[in-house]
């Protein structure tokens, strides 16, 4: 059985500029097909516009508000919103207030599959 606590995970900055704490991924669990992380973007901040060739992502907004952009389409998001980001989709999220969200990736997240504009 694998149980990880968010508070025990060290934060790091991803290639897109967000602050991440991996909850379950290949570095801390016997994960094969997906990963789960908490992401934070400060008010006024945004992730670098990017896409992933292989992985598909879900974002689930826990706190804050912002604007998600997927292939040029924009929408305001807030707590309780779940966002599907298909493989190959250019995306960025801008925080209009401090954002905290869960990010689930399948297959597991890797810097090598993140392509910046």
Q: Residue locations for each model-derived region?
A:
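Conserved short histidine dyad/triad with adjacent acidic residue
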Residues: 37-52
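A cytosolic small-molecule/anion-sensing beta-strand core signal
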Residues: 62, 78-79, 97
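Ligand-binding loop in jelly-roll beta-barrel domains
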Residues: 87-112
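A generic "binding-loop/recognition-motif" signal
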Residues: 43, 54, 73, 89, ...
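Glycine- and acidic-residue-biased ligand/ion/polar-headgroup-sensing regions
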Residues: 54-56, 60-66
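Short acidic-glycine-tyrosine-enriched beta hairpin
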Residues: 73-87
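Histidine-centered metal-chelating micro-motifs
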Residues: 46-48, 67, 83, 87-92
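A short, N-terminal "cap"/entry segment at the start of jelly-roll beta-barrel domains
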Residues: 1-33, 48, 114-117
């Amino acid at each position: 059985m694998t149980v990880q606590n968010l508070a025990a995970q060290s934060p790091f900055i991803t290639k897109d500029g967000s602050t991440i704490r991996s909850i379950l991924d290949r570095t801390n669990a016997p994960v094969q097909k997906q990963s789960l992380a908490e992401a934070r973007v400060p008010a006024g901040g945004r992730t670098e516009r990017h896409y992933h060739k292989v992985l598909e992502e879900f974002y689930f907004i826990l706190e804050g508000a912002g604007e998600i952009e997927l292939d040029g389409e924009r929408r305001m998001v807030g707590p309780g919103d779940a966002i599907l980001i298909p493989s190959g989709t250019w995306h960025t999220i801008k925080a209009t207030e401090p954002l905290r969200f869960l990010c689930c990736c399948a297959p597991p997240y890797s810097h090598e599959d993140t392509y910046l504009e």
